Amino acid sequence: MKLFGGPRYPEDIAKRIPPGQRLVKGWPVLQYGPIPRFNEAEWDFRVFGLVENEYTLSYAELKALGPVKVPADMHCVTGWTTLDNEWEGVPFRMLAERAGPKPEAAWVITHCEYGYTSNLSLQAMMDDDVLVAWANQGEQLAPEHGFPLRLVVPKRYAWKSAKWLRGLEFTDRNERGFWEVRGYHTHADPWRDERYSYEESRDSEAEP
């Protein structure tokens, strides 16, 4: 099958590639700012906001929660796709259930190093394949790919899978993050080709 004038892929591969995407080899590196240094003695991970039980975990405590492995493809808003990634980490759902989101909590803000943030609806984040991950393809994440921790949201463009994750905030407001205020889509569904904010409907407070 030929997609948008691009390369031809076998049918079983083509159906896994969203509109406007192309398959690439390797794992491209894209980021804003320098790679942060990791000091495990000073590092922590916070879950807070509109929850019944705010908590903070060390890196060792987080990794001891009962990791799982999830196979998932990755789609970058710049147009590349990689297939058959295997991620290892803790399900977001597990972290959320431990915190106990309050009824009014409808959005999650991901907080990362250097003040970077991103936003997604709680509904989207509660998918079974959403992970807080520390490994890919059986190996610890490389620093340029998010070590020590990154979010993985397979059903959204990859900027929502924020690198160098430090916290999750539950909120009742759709607060746009770093790239969202710079013109990128709130929901970022690659299968809907949701790349830019001008494509959003007037009511972007709910997941489509």
Feature map (PLM): residue ranges:
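Structured, non-membrane catalytic/scaffold regions adjacent to prosthetic-group chemistry
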Residues: 1-208
